[in-house]
Amino acid sequence: MDYSIKCKSHPWHGINPGTPDEVRAFIEIVPTDTVKYEVDKESGYLSVDRPQKFSNIVPSLYGFIPRTWCNVKMAELTNKALARLDVEGDGDPLDICVLTEKDVTHGDILVRAKPIGGLRLLDNNQADDKIIAVLKNDAIYSKYDDIEDLPVQIVRRLIHYFTTYKDIPGETNQ
């Protein structure tokens, strides 16, 4: 038996992203997390980005698609869609929300998911789009092929989370 230590692939650079119909997603955060985790760009290890400040709970599995990059091309697409010229890419991999009816208890995992749509978002004048996907073979969500087919409340919950999770209660939204 070979018990030697094997190197862990960097989740952003060292893992195949899959195909447009079935992506691999590296999950950083699950709905029960009270801390926002993020992959350290240099080491590839999951690290604490910040404690969740308020009672917002991420409404799905959340992470990124390996080997993607929200930079110049994403900024161009966002500028075109919003009729703007000043949006930049955020320099991170493309974010993904993976819907599942199962309770996944921790992040730092890879899942296979079917993209069904997305949300175009800005964060401090940077493109911060979110791909919305469903977990492969999920008993409830795998029947959905388009974000427009989802129950409206699920889409509203996603939009609400991403438009309010950085807000400070009692202060005007920036």
Name what the model sees in each region.
Residues M1-Q174:
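Hydrophobic N-terminal alpha-helices or hydrophobic patches in metabolic proteins across all domains
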